[in-house]
């Protein structure tokens, strides 16, 4: 799928969640230089194990659109590990069911619904810098993907469930990714 097609054309021709997940995985691995909504020519996050794990999560059917590793709070700076993205209703239900038995937090936004909460996940010099809990709802996904890809993919992603998953423990990285992968493997079986 999409072999030999220029990166932006691959996205313009992509029409499904599964295709978007595969293209995002390739971008995370560095074999694509373009992903919708991201203006840098390549993934600017943590390279190596984190980008590999995020690629695997995409290939399991969870279209990641934002993430960060955890960093211990020191000198007023710190991060909670998080991953946000979109998936099918079935995957959202399984992820929620698997992770509810852990101390990870899963915020779920069904298609057509937004949110306006604020949960701090990044401290910068003792001030809150990044938050989860808010969602642009279906119009955000539709506008973003219509502008950068095509109407068919935008409509498909508009029907997906949006999840924001984070570890409430500042600096911890050992739980979120493995448990999300476990939940997605369960959803696939």
Where does each model-flagged region fall?
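Helix N-cap motif at beta-to-alpha junctions
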Residues: 86-93
